[in-house]
Amino acid sequence: MDGAGLRMGRLFDRDSGRSFITAFDHGTTLRVPPEVGKPLDLLEKIVAGEPDGVLVGPGLLKQGAHLFAFRGAPVPVLRADWTIIDESMKGELGERYRVLTTPKEGAALGAGALVMYLIMGPEEGTMFADNVRAVAHAAHEAHQVGLPLIVEATLWGSRITEKKDPDLLAHICRIAGEIGADAVKTEYTGDPQTMAHVVAGCPVPVLTLGGARGGEDAVVESARGAIEGGAKGLIFGRNVWQADDPVRMTASLREVVHGVPVSG
C-alpha cells in the first residue's frame, strides 16, 4: 500500500468499510444564499457532526484549517477544480472547466484527498477531452505526493438530458476508474438495482452525491437506496448544511452509511 492508499483508508470506517463525507465546496459553482450563514460558522457545524471527511475549496481549507487540527477530526478533502453548475451562469458564460490547484499544493494545505470533476456530454467535445486529460494528469501527480483522487463522474453536460441514465453513469464511472481515480462520486440512479449496475462496472469504490436539497425523509431514503445498491458511502452537501439541524442530519446519514446509531 502506498501513501495514497493509506490516506484513502482513513476516509473509510474500519467496521462498515464505508464513508460519509459532507460536501461544502458549493460556493465556487453555485449561488449560496447569504441567509444560510457565514462559511466558517457553517463549516464548524459540519465538523461538529463528525462526518468521516469534509469536502472544501482551497480558500476555505486555509481559513478553516484549525477546525481539522485535532485527533479524530474529519479528513479535509480538497476540491481541486472548477466548473459552471449554476444554470443561469451557464446561460451567460456557457460550459467551462478549469483546474484550480495541484496535488502538491493540496498536500501542502493538509488535504487528505482531492476531488475533481469528470463531466460527460458538454456541448464542446474538446472540453471533455481536456477534462479527461486534466484528471488523468492529476491522478498521476497525486500518487507521487501520496494523495488519493476522488473523481466526481457525472452526466451534467448540456448534450445529455437524462442526468441519471444508469448505462451512461456506468460508462463515465468506468472511465474515471480507468484514468486513475481511487474512488468515484456520482449520481444515485434512483433505484438500488440500477445503482448496482453502475457499481458493478466500476473498478474503484463508488460513493453517491446528494444533489439539491430535499425533504429529510426522502434524502434518508435515497441514501438507503444507494447503500443497498452497493455504494461504499455518501458525499452529501446541501442536504446537510441547509438542514434545520445539520448535526442531527449528519447523524441520520451516518447511521445509514455505517449501520450504527449515533448517540446524543
Tell where the protein language model's regions lie, with residue ranges.
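Cofactor-binding loop segments of dinucleotide-utilizing enzymes, especially the Rossmann-like FAD-
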Residues: 211
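N-terminal basic/disordered segments at the start of proteins
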Residues: 1-14
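Alpha/beta enzyme core
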Residues: 14, 19-62, 66-70, 75-85, ...
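A short, acidic, flexible beta-alpha connecting loop/helix-capping segment that sits on the rim
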Residues: 238-244
